Amino acid sequence: MIDKIVFEEDEEYDLTQDSFRYGRVTTGASYNLVTGKIPETVLEQVKAKDDENDDVEFEMDHLEDKEAVQKTKTFDELYESQMPKYFEYQSNFSEVNGIWTLLFDQNHYENMSTFELQAAICAALNSKHYMMICVGIDAFNAVTGVEMSAKDRVVFRMALTRAVAGEFQPPLVKVAPKQLTGVSPMKRDISEVTSSIDVLFIPVIGVTDEVENNRFLIVVRVKEISDKVYQISSGRIYNELEGRVVEMSDMNEAFHKLIVEQSISDIQTRRGSMFMLEPEPFLEDSPVIFTGSKEILRENHEIPNILKENSTERSLSQSLLNLLDIQNIGWIFFGTALSCCIYNNAIKPLVK
């Protein structure tokens, strides 16, 4: 269920600072996830880019990619088997296997920016990891959640949509800016334009001093694995190293680590599957194994004999061809024809 709110009727919300509703940000701007504000000078640049990109076509072909759907199902299976539908306040957050998980406490939420989301998502994509960013877990792995109104949740959704749609190269979402956002309220949630990334607000219950249940664990999910190398539009490239988000120095380092090393690991994996398989349990006195061993040995003896015969035939043919001089082949034909004529005209009548 997507939270809805009409911002035009909200006196507390400053529409001029609603940076989530403007075009693709190509200057690497980062805005606050709570207030949604960026500097006015950057906002003007964003508006200018919005006018330039009005004609960009909206494409969602990746949503029909069967392989991507299969990968999403794999993430869903991992997620649904380990994550509950809600959390008790101060309950322990258990380790999630198979999904790279980043944890932030509720105090960090107030100062959290879209740049942190972009860097973590970039690192997950480049490292070929499923990922979850969980906001609302303290240093003791206790789930506290974050107090969020309906407006706060909408702002966070908008921030994530802008961060994903406008800052990655190659683009994660190919969308015309004003089809995605605009002066009107939000038209599309991130889950509507890409199947690879979404956000959930999981209820945190059991807080006695709160009248309404407005406490949630924020979970941003990267649900698909990509073979591409991504960078943020500011030129920064990120990777996962020992569970942390690490910035790479340049594209050359990214190419070496993310492509060359991956290729080497793939080759090693293939070699392992060919030559390093664990042997099956061996029964020494089993007649079945003994009979099978004889058949295998017989087949192994027959194969070299066939190969020897084939190689002998090839060597004889090759030697005959080597004896023939290709340049004198015409003289051979001429001599053959002359012999036939002499035989037919001179020798054959005498024999009769």
From Swiss-Prot:
Keywords: Membrane, Transmembrane, Transmembrane helix. The chain crosses the membrane at residues 326-343. Disulfide bonds: none annotated. It comes from the Eukaryota. Belongs to the Schlafen family. Component of the trimeric PUCH (precursor of 21U RNA 5'-end cleavage holoenzyme) complex, that acts as an endoribonuclease processing the 5'-end of precursor Piwi-interacting RNAs (piRNAs). The PUCH complex consists of tofu-1, tofu-2 and either slfl-3 or slfl-4, where tofu-2 exhibits endoribonuclease activity. PUCH-mediated processing strictly requires a 7-methyl-G cap (m7 G-cap) and an uracil at position three (U3). PUCH also exhibits a strict bias for piRNA precursors with an A or G at position 1. This is Schlafen-like protein 4. It comes from Caenorhabditis elegans.
